[in-house]
């Protein structure tokens, strides 16, 4: 009787943004396909992979701590991801790391795993890997990454130095993945990249093929095709190019969710110029007004930076005035912090930490009031809600206006006879600055 060789076991730590999560899913899918077992503890693992984030200082620190914990608990560690692009920085703190690769280096990661933990010779588990691959999100939603890298050179950002220039995935490949996800039960697809609106720019929007039909490689064409799948499609990381205007009618027609995540970063033309971002606030306000005219249900999410080098009280007041005028639904705000390798570090007139803190508090106080007023307008209305969690007290879901992890929730007390992924019609009964409460219609 032949002896059964135990499956080699790999531990995995995934840090950072949804784009990094997709990279982790791809590596895990390859490992499972090759017959490796992925285990949840360091003790049982033959080796640990840490997929790092390196965007801001706190993320670097979290990544270094995760690497240290994996080394202490296991000893055999491979590092990949954004921080992996800075090998010297990792080796200085953790010289015992076996191998280090940068982001989206899937083949290199697998080669390193093969070197230290050889592939199993017999793989009876191949058929157990689902066609859509290993997913780290709940079954009813998934991230769909359409490109890698970015062509912009914002002075506060080092992503291009880590992930390179824009490389768009073939549109046929993207749409085939989307179809596999829907076939596997996904009800909501979240389109992500470093710059979603630039999709196809690097290949001059060439025509690709899906199911034998020609399809242009562009954000608008992608949205048109995804709308045929009969699921919720949500756009993230949309740089404010002029052609973003073209997706608003698709939202008004119900083809994709009326939700736009569009990072604006500031409202002072002078600060935007220092950031190397587009700088016409009046034009942006006019666009927002026009978008809402075309699609009254539109939810706008954005992110901003306060305390950027050179930001005066006058610049900051322009930002507050913009918030009052734009009345955005969902807003994230970050206090500027120097990122190693960013051009903004060399700018004069760095803003003191106490001023950053004070401005951040004023920003958040104003935006919370605006967000609360925007949500209060929904009380008494009926909305669609996708269920995320159910327990003995009721269900928690999200409206079309809420992306997972970053936006609010809809609480349905006592609604226990539903399951994650169900989409319900709900009457809104109460709201605060972030969340809604309601009951099933």
Curated annotation (Swiss-Prot):
Extent of the signal sequence: none
Cofactor(s) essential for the protein: [4Fe-4S] cluster
An MF annotation (GO) of this entry: 4 iron, 4 sulfur cluster binding
SUPFAM superfamilies: Radical SAM enzymes
GO CC term, one of those recorded: cytosol
Segments forming domain Radical SAM core: 136-373
Protein's UniProt keywords contain Kinase: no
Compartments it resides in: Cytoplasm
EC number: 2.8.4.4
Segments forming domain TRAM: 376-441
Annotated [4Fe-4S] cluster 1 binding sites: 17, 53, 82
Cofactor stoichiometry and binding remark: Binds 2 [4Fe-4S] clusters. One cluster is coordinated with 3 cysteines and an exchangeable S-adenosyl-L-methionine.
Domain MTTase N-terminal, first and last residues per copy: 8-118
GO biological process: tRNA modification
Primary enzyme class: transferase
Enzymatic reactions: L-aspartate(89)-[ribosomal protein uS12]-hydrogen + (sulfur carrier)-SH + AH2 + 2 S-adenosyl-L-methionine = 3-methylsulfanyl-L-aspartate(89)-[ribosomal protein uS12]-hydrogen + (sulfur carrier)-H + 5'-deoxyadenosine + L-methionine + A + S-adenosyl-L-homocysteine + 2 H(+)
Binding-site list for [4Fe-4S] cluster 2: 150, 154, 157
Keyword entries, A-Z: 4Fe-4S, Cytoplasm, Iron, Iron-sulfur, Metal-binding, S-adenosyl-L-methionine, Transferase
Protein family according to the UniProt entry: Belongs to the methylthiotransferase family. RimO subfamily.
HAMAP family noted in UniProt: MTTase_RimO
Protein name as annotated: Ribosomal protein uS12 methylthiotransferase RimO
Organism: Escherichia coli O1:K1 / APEC
